């Protein structure tokens, strides 16, 4: 179903409340990555260009709800936002202070300091919606949470619409899940099958090839009868992995498993690594990355792909030397003619680490939200926007 778009509304002289996801990583009060602030800029600038006054809402971290906590204050975010916009940004400490005027920007302090935010309290939702004439939901990274500022306010506001960032995210995932150019290849990595079981089952229905990596691949290898040594895998989920492999055969989908792997005695820096065929992993070794023949196998499928969705690395890339497979995969995808969507915190972190983010088709800003979309779930705030359209 369609949603009302911010671009289509007359915002001249109006107060526009924009829910963004400015939940940036911080260390000692310093922002270590401002990607989410930069992603919000076009929406805020569009509202200003249309002659609106802007009030921005966001959460930061996980403070005790209803209590002010300086370490979770949005003050550093207000300063960085002001630098990037090239104009002052007022930090409002309370709902009563959250006022603005055409051409001006106010950032309300962390919405999680407000009692009732996470419980989706109707009274708080009405107050947040009532801060302006138009309520813009633009926080894809929080769209999977039914909170007062994400879902409740959207349902309560006089006028509610989707911002450009949220629209771009939904359109990217629509291209992957609902109207994809085929063949479609999904790469699902990460540590545990248990966190991605619904995702794997849903994707298998939609894609042509499902590639598994990381600890997830270890569980599938064990389910296929291979010895995986000391590798991280989930013994209790071997039947589930076997079911998924059987379903792939039934649906005539490809589910290629690694054919060779990089191993070490433990997951730690500067380990002595070894290359083994999957049938020859010693009992004292851990599988920590894919080998070159596996990479070649995966590239064979990716070379034919028109659409690729990547959720999770194929090795322990955060520790050298176990990132070679993930890096090589990222480099291959960066040169691909396919439409590539990278969604999920670790795979996004990987392409950023290797300086390849700008060469991917679309980088999602929301980890949990993108995971829920890939699982086939409806995002509460998007459902609310669709109901209002």
UniProtKB/Swiss-Prot annotation:
Annotated Pfam families: PGK
Gene3D superfamilies, per the entry: Phosphoglycerate kinase, N-terminal domain (3.40.50.1260)
Protein EC: 2.7.2.3
Binding site for substrate: 21-23, 36, 59-62, 112, 145
Transmembrane stretches, start-end: none
Pathway: Carbohydrate degradation; glycolysis; pyruvate from D-glyceraldehyde 3-phosphate: step 2/5
Annotated binding of ATP, by residue: 196, 318, 344-347
One record GO biological process: gluconeogenesis
Catalytic activity field: (2R)-3-phosphoglycerate + ATP = (2R)-3-phospho-glyceroyl phosphate + ADP
GO molecular function terms noted in the UniProt entry: ADP binding; ATP binding; phosphoglycerate kinase activity
Family as reported in the entry's similarity comment: Belongs to the phosphoglycerate kinase family.
Record protein name field: Phosphoglycerate kinase
Organism per entry: Desulfovibrio desulfuricans (strain ATCC 27774 / DSM 6949 / MB)
Gene that specifies this protein: pgk
């Amino acid at each position: 179903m369609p949603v009302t778009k911010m671009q289509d509304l007359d915002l001249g002289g109006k107060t526009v409340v924009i829910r963004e996801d400015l939940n940036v990583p911080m260390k000692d009060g310093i922002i270590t990555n401002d990607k989410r602030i930069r992603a919000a800029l076009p929406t805020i600038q569009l509202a200003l260009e249309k002659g609106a006054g802007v009030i921005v809402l966001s959460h930061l971290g996980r403070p005790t709800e209803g209590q002010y906590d300086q370490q979770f204050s949005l003050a550093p975010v207000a300063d960085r936002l002001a630098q990037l916009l090239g104009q002052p940004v007022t930090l409002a400490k309370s709902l009563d202070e959250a006022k603005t005027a055409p051409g001006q920007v106010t950032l309300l302090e962390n919405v999680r300091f407000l009692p009732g935010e996470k419980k989706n309290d109707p009274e708080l939702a009405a107050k947040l919606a009532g801060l302006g004439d138009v309520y813009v939901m633009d926080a894809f990274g929080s769209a999977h949470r039914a909170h007062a500022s994400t879902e409740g306010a959207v349902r309560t506001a006089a006028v509610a619409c989707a911002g450009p960032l949220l629209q771009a995210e939904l359109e990217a995932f629509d291209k992957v899940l609902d109207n994809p150019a085929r063949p479609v290849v999904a790469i699902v990595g990460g540590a545990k099958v248990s966190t991605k079981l619904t995702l794997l089952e849903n994707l298998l229905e939609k894609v042509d090839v499902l590639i598994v990596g990381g600890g997830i691949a270890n569980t599938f290898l064990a389910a296929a009868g291979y010895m995986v040594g000391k590798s991280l895998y989930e013994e209790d989920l071997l039947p589930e992995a076997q079911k998924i492999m059987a379903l792939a055969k039934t649906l005539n989908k490809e589910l290629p498993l690694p054919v060779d792997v990089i191993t070490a005695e433990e997951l730690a820096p500067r380990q002595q690594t070894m290359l083994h065929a999957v049938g020859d992993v010693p009992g004292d070794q851990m599988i920590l990355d894919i080998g070159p023949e596996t990479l070649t196998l995966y590239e064979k499928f990716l070379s034919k792909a028109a659409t690729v969705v990547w959720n999770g690395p194929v090795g322990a890339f955060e520790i050298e030397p176990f990132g070679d497979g993930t890096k090589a995969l990222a480099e291959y995808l960066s040169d691909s003619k396919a439409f590539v969507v990278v969604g999920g915190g670790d795979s996004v972190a990987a392409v950023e680490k290797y300086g390849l983010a700008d060469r991917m088709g679309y980088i999602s800003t929301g980890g949990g939200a993108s995971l829920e979309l890939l699982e086939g779930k409806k995002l509460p705030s998007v459902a609310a926007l669709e109901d209002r359209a």
